[in-house]
Amino acid sequence: MIEQPAACRIHVEALGPTFEAQAEQWAQRLNLPLQVADGEFALQVGEQGLQLQQLGPDAPGPVRVDFVEGGAAHRRLYGGGSGQMIAKAVGIAQGVRPRVLDATAGLGKDAFVLASLGCEMSLIERQPLIGALLEDGLARAAEDFDVAPIVARMKLLKGNSIEVMRNWEGEPPQVIYLDPMFPHREKTALVKKEMRLFRPLVGDDPDAPALLEAALALATHRVVVKRPRKAPCIEGPKPSHALDGKSSRYDIYPKKALKA
């Protein structure tokens, strides 16, 4: 069953007869109904792939994962390369491209940036609905000539991040990247469409301290936690230092140096 607050009513919807079979497959996989009268969210299947649409008169537009066009393409082409703060945070340097686990993958935007810079990425997304969007986006990107080599470096894992890390099999990641959902209490803050859409489904991350603990136990070289710039550190061990941006920062928990 979908991991979600009970109040959320979600159904799967085909945006045309040609997508009905795919819609039925997603409904079965996610244990969701097809077309209900009073739904709050619709997981829609159409020409542009899988998208999540909040329903109602004031709802924002649909959210989908698109690594080929839009913001992901612009950041890939003009985003600053290895000079980006996230690249510095995970330890990318000349001759150094660490193996990274993004344990809070979401829509995969940060993981895609790191993969485009040459990192081998593992991604964990615990919310099945968001995981479905990410899986669909990766599959469509794999068909694009320019982007296929990048997403080939992105391996999607399903499940609870803490449990996956505690029971990790095989070679451990050198770096683990965490971006847990943080409570936005400022009523005037402009929250991105994705966050407004996902918060009712996912909620905040009260288990962030356990997430950090599991990451520190598994990563061989460092753990990086992305936080709102003025937010407190995650409860537990303190970071050795942080990289500050305009709206967010990266708390760094080093274990040993990354070398070429």
Curated annotation (Swiss-Prot):
Similarity section: Belongs to the methyltransferase superfamily. RsmJ family.
GO cellular component: cytoplasm
Listed EC numbers: 2.1.1.242
Residues at which S-adenosyl-L-methionine binds: 125-126, 179
Native organism: Pseudomonas fluorescens (strain Pf0-1)
Keyword entries, A-Z: Cytoplasm, Methyltransferase, rRNA processing, S-adenosyl-L-methionine, Transferase
Gene that encodes it: rsmJ
Domain of life: Bacteria
Protein name: Ribosomal RNA small subunit methyltransferase J
Catalytic reaction(s) noted: guanosine(1516) in 16S rRNA + S-adenosyl-L-methionine = N(2)-methylguanosine(1516) in 16S rRNA + S-adenosyl-L-homocysteine + H(+)
UniProt function note: Specifically methylates the guanosine in position 1516 of 16S rRNA.
Compartments in which it is found: Cytoplasm
Transmembrane segments: none
